[in-house]
Amino acid sequence: MQMFITRLAAAAALACSSAAFAAISADEAKALGTTLTPIGAEVAANKDGTIPAYGGGLTTPPAGFKAGDGIRPNPYAGEKPRLTIDAKNMGQNAAQLTEGTKALLQKYPSFRVDVYPTHRSVAFPKWVADNTAKNATKAKTLNDGRSIEGAQAGFPFPIPKTGYEAMWNHLVRFNGQSYEAKYRNLNVDASGRTALATEGVSNQEFPYWDPSKASDTYWRIKLTYTGPARRAGEALMIVDPIDMGTKDRRAWTYLPGQRRVKVAPDLAHDTPNPGTAGATTFDDTFIFNGSMDRFDFKLVGKKEMIVPYNDYAAVYQSKQDDLLKPNHLNPDLVRWELHRVWIVEATLREGKRHVYSKRTFYLDEDSWAALASDEYDARGQLYRTGFAYMAPSYDLPAPYTDMFGHYDLVSRLYSLTGFIAETGGLKHTKPLADREWTADALAGSGVR
């Protein structure tokens, strides 16, 4: 498959400097809402018709959906795969598979990829489109791409020119302004044994998406652990600034045994994530999360790739024991589709430290969410591979990719983060009061 490099993506080859990158011109922005969707995806179908033209996404809930319920029925439940890929026929489809997907097909005979008809189901409220159009000609990156300015309540860079701009679209991706879920994080070891890493309640907010007021915070999360028993009562809070070039992530933990809140500056980058019992790094969260200061991010281009998509069966309808199987998730429950993705390569900066020397990210053109990643070790060998399981909230509407997982190709362990099918699903909520995002409030949230 030929890589589709746009003339804008070609600009990513230019060396980065500390100077600000300029916003796009008004003439360039005219493509939004015409040949491009309001957030920057190609409207047209692909040449073969295997990717349809964008028609506005899915905004009507299917039969069986109950307003206010956290569980969302599968609107495509009756469909059958149009193609099944396994190790035997992988070569015929290799150009549309990530390196991680190919590695899993080669490593595990039971792993397969069931490719279903493509549905461009992602949709957004009109105000997201309107604000994205405003941002397009004003938003800029600063501090080697690690900060942004001139953007609010819309995607900052619908027509990206650099890898940093594309990754900012992912970092601020719209899942709704605020939401809550009871979740489980689970690990499956090389022997096939499933272990609970953590479970609890997650409250997430994106103050960036508040159209009524500007904020210097783009994302914040509060986790209250209810299990396993030895972790019950612990709590964690993270607040990420829009200006990550000059400001650090703020993070706190509460340990009930000590009965005090501690500042936790190390909850970032390649620190092992206690939420997954160390199976992933902190910046593996949501495929990528946090500051971009450890890597150089290059926008490679756009390509048609087979990625997890419309995974309502796995995210909302599955049972834990049915979904988690030895070596990998149950292929019967994972839906893959052909979509256009932006490819961003991240290379470790000289003088910086990280367990990964290189990373490749695959960003969905319709949502800007990272749907897959490949992570390489210090020797340049493929080490881990990650996938996010898109299941849009058609009732809002908004994308949703907070169930994600990583496969460790060395230890043969894999993790699944954000399993919500048996714990009430995802509920969109009103933002918490600012006082709930303080250290004192974190201490009060931890209960045993």
Model-derived features: positions:
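Gram-negative bacterial Sec-dependent N-terminal signal peptides
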Residues: 1-22
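Phenylalanine-focused residue identity feature
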Residues: 4, 21, 65, 111, ...
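Generic serine detector
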Residues: 17-18, 25, 110, 121, ...
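Gly/Pro-enriched, hydrophobic low-complexity segments
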Residues: 23-24, 29-56, 98, 222-292, ...
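Solvent-exposed N-terminal domain segments of exported/luminal and surface proteins
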Residues: 26-248, 255
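Short, surface-exposed, charge-dense and proline/glycine-enriched linear segments
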Residues: 74-82, 209-215, 294-300, 403-420, ...
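Extended beta-strand-rich segments in extracellular/periplasmic secretory proteins, especially
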Residues: 167, 175-187, 194-227, 231, ...
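Long, C-terminal catalytic modules of enzymes
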Residues: 422-448
